[in-house]
Amino acid sequence: MSGLALEFCNVSKFFRDKTEQEIAILRNTNLQIHTGEIIALIGASGVGKTTTLQIAGLLNKQDSGKVKICGKEASHLDTTLRRKEIGFIYQFHHLLSELNVLKNVMLPLLISGTPKTIAEKRAKELLEFLKLEKVAYQPVDTLSGGQKQRVAVARAVIKKPALIIADEPTGNLDPNTAKDVFDLVCSFAKENGSAVFLATHDPSFLQKASRVLEIVNHSLISSI
């Protein structure tokens, strides 16, 4: 992969409060994230970090401006583009309890049309790398919090996406486990040339970021 994984061109996003007053989250915001970059997003609670990541991940539509993924303009919430090019990791893993570990990891490939035998082979390789092969056929509810989040990382990266969106991915973990999970995300991103757009409150993660951006006055500005 090379070039731009994500681009905002004059992106604005508003919402209405209880009094129907229009409140800006982003206003005429420009952003470029290159493949291989790890971009940390910081800001006070409620300032719009999650909404910004949702717009980047084509889960929430901007009110004006353009969003491009790998140079392709997403004029709407493009499910095909999202499934192909974007992986998601959240604070709460959102694994499917009705599926075992292996099937959870396989799921993105199966949805995108990858043959089951190939999807299973890739998923097993990932679980072996993560030292989770012994729990591959266990229900996800039997895993520890750290194990669940590593499975969530595997599910996010198995497609080798151009862009990984991570919204407080370690916020529910102890510091040592959080570091392990974050290191895994960085390792996979480096190996695959993926960009990472990460919202975090953890100052230790900022040291590994290519850039740190902060939402200030409805715009993304460089910080630290």
Curated annotation (Swiss-Prot):
Lineage per the UniProt record: Bacteria, Pseudomonadati, Pseudomonadota, Alphaproteobacteria, Rickettsiales
Ligand binding (ATP): 43-50
SUBUNIT field: The complex is composed of two ATP-binding proteins (LolD) and two transmembrane proteins (LolC and LolE).
Keywords linked to the UniProt accession: ATP-binding, Cell inner membrane, Cell membrane, Membrane, Nucleotide-binding, Translocase, Transport
GO cellular component: plasma membrane
Function: Part of the ABC transporter complex LolCDE involved in the translocation of mature outer membrane-directed lipoproteins, from the inner membrane to the periplasmic chaperone, LolA. Responsible for the formation of the LolA-lipoprotein complex in an ATP-dependent manner.
Matching Gene3D superfamilies: P-loop containing nucleotide triphosphate hydrolases (3.40.50.300)
Keyword Magnesium tagged: no
Protein name per the record: Lipoprotein-releasing system ATP-binding protein LolD
Family assignment from sequence similarity: Belongs to the ABC transporter superfamily. Lipoprotein translocase (TC 3.A.1.125) family.
E.C. no: 7.6.2.-
ABC transporter domain mapped to chain residues: 6-224
Taxonomy, superkingdom: Bacteria
GO molecular function per UniProt: ATP binding; ATP hydrolysis activity; transmembrane transporter activity
